[in-house]
Amino acid sequence: MKVFSNTHTFNYSWEEVSTANWRKYCPWNDKSTHVIAVDTLAREVDPATGILRTERLITCKQSAPEWLKSIIGGMETSQVFETSYVDPAAKTVTMVSQNITWANMVNVQETVVYRPLDAHRTQFEQDARITALCGGWQRIKSSIEDTLVTRFRENATKGKEGFECVLAMSRRVFAEEREKEKMRIEGKMMA
């Protein structure tokens, strides 16, 4: 098993980050063009805790190296099952994902947590555990795990840059909408 861990501080409030998280794979993010679809499978709020639980299926274009595709299958797309928990009281967003594609050959479990550092900054923590399940071929297992850790590292940089674009656009759009609403209310008061 190999582990990839990553942290980053976003200069946006937890409220901004937790809201923009749902738009992470939208056209505003030109770094996530590999994401073909994000399907929400289930969503519910626990009445006792107020925690929003969402299950999503994320479908991506495959970018695995050819040598790896030849070992574990040459599929063009891959799917990931994600369960997220938004806890407004504790101010945390926790996302846990598991690969569906190639699950009999490679197990990839990722956990991402967003939590506020202060009123204007949010801490991002990412932890991925990658285990190749290729029987006794330790050298091949290590090569697969090393390759996937490298991909996680590369994608972490792209993901951070893409989410920064989404956050900036979200802030701009929300500011414009607040201004429109303010003008609408002021217009009603003058009438």
Residue ranges, per PLM feature:
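Glycine-rich portal/gate segments that line the openings of hydrophobic small-molecule binding cavities
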Residues: 39-97
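Terminal "cap-and-tail" regions of soluble proteins that handle hydrophobic small molecules
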Residues: 2-7, 71-76, 87-191
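Generic detector of isolated residues embedded in canonical secondary-structure elements
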Residues: 15-18, 83, 125
